Each structure stands twice: as C-alpha cells, then as structure tokens.
Amino acid sequence: MLADGEVGTAKKDDDAGGFFFTADDHEALIHRPKPLADEAVPSGNGIAAFALQRLGFLLCETRYLDAAERTLRACWRALDEYPHGHVSLLTALEEYLEHPEVIIIRGDKDELARWQSAADKLYAPRRLVFGISRTEQGLPGALADRKPASA
C-alpha cells in the first residue's frame, strides 16, 4: 500500500477522504462501500487513520498525517451520530487530538534493551518507544536522518 510512497492510492477516496472497501480497479459495482462502523472487526477506516497517524509521527511525514486527518473528517458525521459504533475511529481521533510522545532510541542491542526497559517502566499510554539498531541501514523518512551517536 505504501511501497510507492503514496497513501493507499487504489482504495483512497480523493474527493471526500477515507478509504473504500474495494480498490478502484475492482469490477464495476453499483455501490462502492466505505466502511466506517466497527463490527466483528474494527473499521478499516478507523485502523487506517490510526496506522497512518502512527506512521506519520514515526517518520515525520505530513502526507500520512494529512491522509489520517482527511479520513477522520470524512467520518465525522458518523462519529457524531453514533460514537459507540465507531470505537476504532474514536481511538484515532483521540490520538489526533492528543499526539503521542515518540521516543526513538538508536544504539547497540544491549543499550536498546536497557533504554527501552527504562522507558517502558513508567506508565505513559501516549508514549511510543522504538528501538533501532545502530547498524540498521536503509531506514525510511526522518529515521534515516537520525544517526546514532558515536560509541
């Protein structure tokens, strides 16, 4: 979905925001559904908005944050009318309104384990901690710019 650098182009609704259930190259349908409500599984749009936000925060990529915001805006009426049926969208909205704290740790394997353990000890539900090896190559986005300190 993101390999070409685009945000879900085959399922994205460029006009209204959000994502359709089927790709644009799918057989012709009378109605192209865009699921918003959670059922036995969470809504694809709720999960997409949540994942795009997390990816945007991690990589410092506004295109992912913008796509998440457009999805939330497209779903606003459904959220307003029946919030209990849209928990995955509410979760994404909550994180949109109160951004997470992102901690990226680069270092050797032993250092990573120690720092991650220390960061995880404090209860912080809005904290995302990522440990990336000092030797990791080919990182995307802003992660490539964050070089580990010299040993």
Regions found by a protein language model. Name each.
Residues 1-151:
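Glycan-recognition and catalytic cores of secretory/periplasmic carbohydrate-active enzymes
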